Regions:
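Secretory targeting signals
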Residues: 1-3
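N-terminal capping segment at the start of a domain
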Residues: 27-60, 76, 83-85, 209-218, ...
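Noncatalytic luminal/extracellular "stalk/propeptide" segments of secretory-pathway proteins
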Residues: 35-39, 46-164
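Soluble metallo-hydrolase cores and metallopeptidase-like ectodomains found primarily
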Residues: 106-139, 213-290, 298-306
């Protein structure tokens, strides 16, 4: 979707008018910087977490991470509850391949929960079946279907109204085009009789497309699907329809009734009747998608050092599983369903996700080649809330930080992430959700080289200040 010039001018005028709020907000009452865990302590945990590899829902790396979170919270003196779920876990093994007559074609990644070919692969004539969303499936039976897509535009100028921007010299983008798969359902290809699907990225660089775990939280597709970059896809496109046969290999295992756990940690405050909730999810492919839980551990450590009598409200930390297995494991929705009494007591919620992100973008070079590079800036932190009181508190809390943040009101949808369900439950909620290109990428190093330890620590400090500011308001003021 193209954002019109008129809408862009309106958007720019609106955010420029709102940006100056709280240029130098006073420190919140009760904040004690010396109690915050050090940057080194937080980053050491981040490096350890990244070395676990992708923490897809319920896999061994994810289970190790969840155990670490539970034991860390217990060591800080918090009450810890573990809620167990089971589901049929699908996970790819080895590197997918495409081959034809001894020639190999590089595979960028696979479609999660798509299917499995076994080690021998599946072979069929290669045919081109169209570009998303217009496919011609009339001739795919018994064949390998090649399709392509362009990434979608998120029209932020339409979805959001800005409460405030930090730093105020920045202009919040009117739109975003992160690297996400646009084809969300392969079952029509399976129904039409195709034996495999090859999906080509058209407008994303090969480096950006590599290892993308997209789309996530989809039900089993029952047909193997793999991605290729635009250049490899162009070579395959030239072969499609010529009678050439290709073999696709995507090995995967399904573990029936695999266990996975949500962790709920509670730090009692002076009042048990009022709760501030700090939540995140624990499953994901890399160093940033699921690192919000490290932020919560740091915040729990900070607030546990403050005497209980000085903690106005109890803090509850739901760290949920199932963000990447939504059809089976309900993530924050399950927590809400299981804990109606806690939800009734919650006066505010802050969802913490995707910390420390630097901005990496594709850029078109001379000749049309697309390069992927670090822009030298921090990624935009999109902080979503329909609550004006909560927005004002965050706009003040972020002042002086390293964060590059847009605090926005989702007037036309776009409340992404784990905070949306809490907001729908009637809780004044901030969903803090930076959305870098590499958010769903699952390389061996977890994209940790794309993160900033300084930014991550600064963001955790912002959340600590935000909780203090929340506790400076009554429940009625927070709901105003």
């Amino acid at each position: 979707m193209t954002v019109s010039r008129r809408r862009f001018i309106q958007w720019t005028a609106a955010i420029t008018a709102l940006a100056p709020r709280g240029l130098r907000a006073a420190e919140p009452r009760g904040y004690r910087a010396e109690l915050l865990p050090s940057q080194k302590e937080v980053w050491d945990q981040q490096v350890w977490m990244a070395r676990l590899g992708p923490k897809y829902t319920g896999n061994p790396a994810h289970a190790t991470f969840v155990d670490f979170l539970a034991s860390s919270m217990q060591a800080l003196g918090l009450e810890v509850q573990r809620d167990r779920y089971t589901f049929d876990r699908w996970e790819a093994s080895g590197q997918p391949t495409i081959a034809s007559k001894g020639r190999r074609f590089d595979v960028s990644s696979y479609f999660p929960y798509s299917g499995s070919t076994g080690a021998e692969g599946t072979t069929g004539e290669l045919v081109y079946a169209g570009s998303n969303p217009r496919f011609d499936l009339s001739g795919v039976r018994g064949k390998v279907a090649l399709v392509d897509f362009t990434i979608n535009t998120r029209d932020w100028a339409h979805q959001y109204q800005a409460w405030g921007i930090h730093p105020p010299t920045e202009t919040f983008p009117s739109a975003s085009r992160p690297a996400r798969g646009a084809i969300n359902d392969l079952t029509p290809f399976q129904t039409a009789g195709a034996v495999a699907v090859i999906i080509r990225w058209l407008d994303v660089s090969p480096m950006n497309a590599a290892d993308q775990y997209t789309p996530f939280s989809r039900p089993p597709q029952n047909i193997p699907g793999v991605y290729v970059g635009r250049d490899v896809g162009a070579r395959l496109r030239a072969l499609a329809g010529t009678g050439v046969r290709v073999t696709v290999v995507l090995e995967a295992e399904t573990t029936a009734d695999a266990p996975t756990e949500t962790i709920v940690a509670t730090l009692p405050g002076a009042s048990d009747d009022d709760i501030v909730m700090l939540n995140t999810h624990t499953d994901g492919p890399n160093a940033t998608e699921e690192n919000g839980a490290l932020g919560l551990v740091a915040l729990a450590k900070y607030f546990s050092k403050i005497p209980r009598a000085e903690r106005r409200r109890s803090l509850v930390f739901p760290m949920t599983t199932g963000h990447f297995a939504g059809p089976w494991v309900p993530s924050i929705r399950g927590f809400i369903q299981k804990n109606p009494d806690l939800i009734k007591k919650t006066v505010a919620a802050v969802t913490v996700e995707h910390l420390g992100c630097r901005e990496w973008l594709d850029e078109v070079a001379t000749g049309g080649a697309i390069g992927y590079r670090d822009t030298g800036r921090m990624e935009w932190s999109v902080a979503i809330t329909p609550s004006k009181p909560m927005a004002n508190l965050l706009v003040d809390a972020v002042q002086g930080s390293l964060d590059r943040a847009g605090v926005v009101n989702p007037v036309k949808g776009g409340f992404l992430g784990e905070g949306s369900s809490l907001s729908r439950a009637g809780i004044p909620t901030i969903g803090y959700i930076p959305q870098p290109n590499y958010l769903l990428a699952g390389p061996a190093d977890g994209c940790i080289e794309k993160l900033s330890p300084e930014l991550m620590h600064s963001q955790i400090e912002v959340f600590a200040k935000l909780v203090h500011r929340i506790n400076g308001l009554t429940a009625a003021e927070l709901r105003a």
